[in-house]
Amino acid sequence: MNYLITIIGPTAIGKTSLSIALAKQYNCDIISCDSRQFFKEMRIGTAVPSDEELSQATHHFIQNKSIFEEYTVGDFEKEAITKLDELFSKNNIQIMVGGSGLYADAVLKGFDSFPNIKPEIREKIQEQYDENGIQYLQQKLQELDTEYYSKILSQNPQTLQNPQRMMRFVEVCLGTGKPYSSFLNKDKITRNFTTIIIGLEADREIMYDRINQRVDIMINEGLLAEAEKLYPNKDLNALQTVGYRELFSFFDADFTLNFAIEEIKKNTRRFSKRQITWFKRTENTIWFDYKADTSKIIEVINTKMKH
């Protein structure tokens, strides 16, 4: 029986140190599913593990891509599963760690695959949105995929106010002639491993304090210079992220440096709240306080593997 020990939790909670301790305990590798840490040009602002940490266990999917490459969650799923198959042939226990819930889910449950849509369809939808606003997209989705519209309305109503998501739903409907919901993964994907999910949590005040400290450390380590180097490419998808966006606004003279740093802290706190919301929905997670003794966590994992 293969086991994938998956460590989840918000940013700055201590997932890296726990994953390394477990990798040493089980003599195995670590798969990173932190989508911000894939890119080699973004090191400080994404809190990539230090060289010392990376030397303590073999890590995969850290700084292995360039911001100039298009890399999707579907690509990651394929590559991660291929890598896990290879690793499981040597050791039946492996570790996955990261704060990107969508990417973790893709490995654990499979990712919905959508056909490519012609760019001109997207352009037309964009024009309609520019002219008629979000109501146009809401009406269109209700008309083209009533089932999915109702599902969003009942489960996640704020999505109806998100133009990017709504345009995506409508373009899939118009580009394929089928409802968006027909492409969602209805079949249970079977994996060749059993998952043990360990979640780390802390009180909000502690979390926020850790985030503020981490941002200060990033600034001291040279985040400003890293962002400045990336500034000419600021419109790339990979760079539309906390820690860089705010400094680009400083370079644009929209923010003072102090204000940009405060915005990074505020937006990272918001990001961590969204992570917590996502992870709290993850079934069968065994939650531990961020200061929990590693030996206790190992004990629980070993018990799970015996059953």
From Swiss-Prot:
One of its GO terms (molecular function) is tRNA dimethylallyltransferase activity. Its EC number is 2.5.1.75. GO terms for biological process: tRNA modification. Keywords: ATP-binding, Magnesium, Nucleotide-binding, Transferase, tRNA processing. Residues 34-37, 164-168 are annotated as: Interaction with substrate tRNA. It catalyses: adenosine(37) in tRNA + dimethylallyl diphosphate = N(6)-dimethylallyladenosine(37) in tRNA + diphosphate. The record marks S100, R122 as: Interaction with substrate tRNA. Pfam families: IPPT (PF01715). Its cofactor is Mg(2+). Substrate binds at T11, A12, I13, G14, K15, T16. The keyword Nucleotide-binding applies. It is an enzyme of class 2 (transferase). Monomer. HAMAP family: IPP_trans. PANTHER family: TRNA DIMETHYLALLYLTRANSFERASE (PTHR11088:SF60). Catalyzes the transfer of a dimethylallyl group onto the adenine at position 37 in tRNAs that read codons beginning with uridine, leading to the formation of N6-(dimethylallyl)adenosine (i(6)A). Belongs to the IPP transferase family. This is tRNA dimethylallyltransferase.
